[in-house]
Amino acid sequence: MKKLFLLVLIIGFVGCKNDKKINRTLPSLDRSELILKYAKGFSVVDYGQYKILKINSPWPKSEKTYTYLLLTKEQAMVSTFNKDDYDAIITIPIEKIVVTSTTHIPALELLGVEQTLVGFPGTDYVSSEKVRGLIDTKKIRELGENEGINTEVLLELNPDLVVGFGIDGNNKTFETIKKSGIPVIYNGDWVEDSPLAKAEWIKFFGVLFNKVAEADSIFNQIEKDYLDAKALASKVTTKPSVLSGAMHKDVWYLPNGTSPEAQLLKDANVNYLYSETTGSGSLALSFESVFEKAKAADLWLSPSYYSSFEALEKANQHYTKFDAFKNKSIYTFVNTTGATGGVLYYELGTTRPDLVLKDLIKICHPELLKDYKPYFFKPLNR
């Protein structure tokens, strides 16, 4: 009987030891998923002791899902996770970051963490006054160009994370950075199919900086303002016809009808002349086909990089035959720039589609939003 008691005691003791080991290595049963209303390109699951971030299709036709383990410093010190199971293990909150697109900067600023940005490729393209101040005081280093980032400077900065973007995943610089031990995450906001889906990527940065609640609150306000503006525009009965884009060499590029840009025009309640088209990427049309369809368009928006009627006419005299040219009804965002020439729309437009939509409503339905001053768009210079 005594031997049986000792045997049970030993089994119980060994079981307790094994249980302790299991508790340190197995995932927690508690889990909550980050709520995303529009974005499809990423997901976050919080297991209490750690988070799993997944990036899906960060560029067109991408077939790989990238998986990242997010741990606090305290959790990282006792972690027994296998690094080979993840594309990277990242310690949060991020204290030093490098981002590679101006579209990433507004999220940092809105979350109040712009001071964590230590390097950027192409600092002249940055328009944000706060971030320009950090650049001017040498707190943010110049890293060259996105496809040829100065890895020597970047490795010297030793950021906790590099947030990149890619069109096909074949970026040798990012591979070099990863091999040095610095994690790289591809941001796929630009692949999303709606303006609000793109804007919701602020929640991606919210997770990285332990500011989930703040990111959620900011996005909710952007969403509300966007939907309120859309509802206001829906009440009008007169819809101006709209042309977009311009020629590049022998091809006229303009948004297809299922693009985020076309969605903005739809929500502004205008007659976008190519709203019925579908497909991925931009439409690529001949001048003749566009002229035939859009010669009498009431408005011409975003005529490529042209900033004035003179520049547009010099590029192609045939542009002058459009009614929108004759009536001086052409609007562009390229004339709204930062101190060093960066186009504000390219930087902020993704995060603030509410402002883009209000700009379009102000232009297309001037009787609405009477006290609103367009943020990005201006009439083409005469």
Set out the residue ranges of the language-model regions.
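Flexible, glycine-rich surface segments
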Residues: 229-316
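A short, gly/pro- and small-residue-rich
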Residues: 114-117, 176-188, 312-331
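Structural recognition of the beta-strand scaffold that forms the well-ordered cores
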Residues: 96-99, 116-120, 161-165, 184-187, ...
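Bacterial Sec-dependent N-terminal signal peptides
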Residues: 1-22
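Bacterial Sec-exported substrate-binding components of ABC uptake systems
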Residues: 16-105, 214-243, 309, 326, ...
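Solvent-exposed, polar/charged alpha-helical surfaces in well-ordered, non-transmembrane soluble domains
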Residues: 95, 105-109, 152-156, 175, ...
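A short, structured surface patch at a secondary-structure boundary
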Residues: 60-155, 161-166
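Extracytoplasmic substrate-binding proteins
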Residues: 139, 160-163, 170-251, 275-276, ...
